[in-house]
Amino acid sequence: MTSTKEIKNKIVSVTNTKKITKAMEMVAVSKMRKTEERMRSGRPYSDIIRKVIDHVTQGNLEYKHSYLEERKTNRIGMIIISTDRGLCGGLNTNLFKQVLFKIQNFAKVNIPCDLILFGLKSLSVFKLCGSNILAKATNLGENPKLEELINSVGIILQEYQCKRIDKIFIAYNKFHNKMSQYPTITQLLPFSKKNDQDASNNNWDYLYEPESKLILDTLFNRYIESQVYQSILENIASEHAARMIAMKTATDNSGNRIKELQLVYNKVRQANITQELNEIVSGASAVSID
């Protein structure tokens, strides 16, 4: 039978673990709120750039930008955004499953995939898979700078412009709320126009100087950069939300485990006391008989 001392040591150990997970939960809540604020403030920027591009391209039907050109798919590129750290439940695992499924589907029709990786977790997984990694960036922190991302994004854009890559996708975890984060894979290039009522509306609030087609190059690059940056913010917010949930679950489980150990401790202690009483009674009986 386990001794009361061993059970006490287990209770102390689980209690210490509970304190750690509770602290990590509170830190994750604080970081999630800050990142969520930055993430939500950045969404309108990406949406408006897309609307401007839709409007400009609609007004210049004779001008065909390379980012709008649909061509036969011989090779694809994928930007994968993961976390640098663990302890966030199945956040990375669920994303990697979808990414690998998509890559395998392209591989079945002999279409290879080149990768741009953000985050240590994606690097460790796809390095083991033997994937062709064009560039990587890790340890971006809580508030990544756009300058840190431009080089990696520029590499895959250069590959696309040189027609060595025909489609570019981006994979990340989209933040819905603190309880829901969804693995998402969207196509970045070629750019697909939206049949947006605002874009087709003649009443438009913008004038373009210089001519609209001269600014499309800049607009497209800014759009791609903003989409990647926004996706990274979405993934960071998802990471903190997932970690908050994981740590809350761990804290609750620790509490339940402490209760179970306390019950076992009481039973063992009671059994020991009962045994000692029986020994005392037996000893007293033996003395009285003598």
Curated annotation (Swiss-Prot):
List localization entries.
Cell inner membrane
A GO molecular function held by the record: proton-transporting ATP synthase activity, rotational mechanism
Where it mainly occurs, coarsely classed, is membrane
Q: Keywords on this record?
A: ATP synthesis, Cell inner membrane, Cell membrane, CF(1), Hydrogen ion transport, Ion transport, Membrane, Transport
What's any GO biological process attached to this entry?
A: proton motive force-driven plasma membrane ATP synthesis
Gene3D superfamilies per record: 3.40.1380.10, ATP synthase, gamma subunit, helix hairpin domain (1.10.287.80)
Write out the GO cellular component annotations: plasma membrane; proton-transporting ATP synthase complex
* HAMAP family xrefs: ATP_synth_gamma_bact
Its biological purpose:
Produces ATP from ADP in the presence of a proton gradient across the membrane. The gamma chain is believed to be important in regulating ATPase activity and the flow of protons through the CF(0) complex.
Q: What name does the UniProt record give this protein? A: ATP synthase gamma chain
Organism equals Buchnera aphidicola subsp. Acyrthosiphon pisum (strain APS) (Acyrthosiphon pisum symbiotic bacterium)
